[in-house]
Amino acid sequence: MHAPGSLILSLLLAATVAGTSPALAAPPGQGAHAHDHHGAAPQLRLDHGRKWATDAPLREGMTRMRALVAPQLAAAHAGRIDAQAYADLAGKLDVEVGTIVSNCKLSPQADAVLHVILSDLTAGSSAMAGRTPGADRAHALVQVATAVNTYGRYFEHRGFTPIAIGH
């Protein structure tokens, strides 16, 4: 990824794995999305009406995360996933996020949009792992699936199919 984004995403991932708020893990004055030079947090947006370009590490990581999450939703909605299974899935998702953070190279603008998505994804993963007191793990899985789908709406990824989230 772009160097400044890599630092922020690394801090975001470390905070999520440690169970702290990403905003608390960032350097002072730099929340989880703070490398925007105009002071506003990055927002989800297209690249002049087009999806953002991706690279192989990002596409591969998101494909693997989709494959991990999609088959679990029906069982989660039915209450058939236990705490350990959620924690195991969260650990696998955290590995994928770490791989993306370490290996993908995006433009600074695309990187900023990806930060928003990965922040939502890692917040859901943290809750699934039990690192967010009182969180509903099934709802957290839906949050992760929604973040994966958001990626598909904002990033070019030939063949990407959104996850059916229905209840």
Annotated model-derived regions:
Residues 54-61, 82-89, 113-117, 140, ...:
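Amphipathic alpha-helix face/heptad-repeat signature
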Residues 9-19:
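Bacterial N-terminal signal peptides
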Residues 26-81, 163:
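Immediate post-signal-peptide N-terminus of mature secreted/exported proteins
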Residues 103, 114-167:
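Helix-rich interaction surfaces within compact, conserved domain-sized segments
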Residues 1-10:
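Bacterial N-terminal signal peptides that target proteins for export
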Residues 96-115:
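Short, solvent-exposed, charged loop/turn and helix-capping segments
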Residues 20-25:
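Sec/Tat signal peptide C-region and signal peptidase I cleavage site
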